[in-house]
Amino acid sequence: MGYVFDLDGTLVDSVPTLLRVINKVLEENSLPLSDRVENLSVAGWGLLPMFEKTLRNRISDEREIARMSSEMLVLYREDPVTGTVPYPGAYDFLMHLSEIGEHTALITNKLLTPATMILDRCFPDFRFTRIYSPDEGWEPKPSNLSLQDFRRRYPEGLLTYIGDTELDYRTASNTADRIYLATWGYRGRDRLISDGFPEDILIDDFSQISE
């Protein structure tokens, strides 16, 4: 059996970090600041698309959007950790999986360095069996190649995938035996239900994940 996790919106709340970066650039360019509601609405498809969507809500000049998006990306990579915190129950659940000897993986569209920095800060005593990221040669989600690789390496038992967005669902479909979407993440319960996801895959707490 193996457990595979998304990072942002599933294990950690990175919105405060993202808003710090986004609003610094917006303020420097005399643009309206962003907030948590807007950030959740544009999150889930990677950093650059998030930054670009935030800027397109304010301006239409593509050159300026490209310039400011690049500035946001640089600022984020300088410090991807400050403000990011684990969701309640995440640390205990990961440690439980480690104690009972389960194989675990992280599949993230983040680069490996910022992802590792976040893990070291939020989960200092836990180590994933494997981490999959784009700069390690893996296609970003919704590609399921990384998930298929994990399944080939650890074929025994059920494969469980835990994410929080439609991107995660697409990644896990037809590969994972069980899929859970966290309602505390970027989409929330109401949005996930309105998007057509069945309630029996939605979880409000890590304790609802079957073993």
Predicted regions, residues:
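N-terminal helical cap/lid subdomain that shapes the substrate entry/recognition surface
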Residues: 1-92, 100, 113
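Asp-based, Mg2+/Mn2+-dependent phosphohydrolase catalytic module
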Residues: 1, 98, 112, 116-211
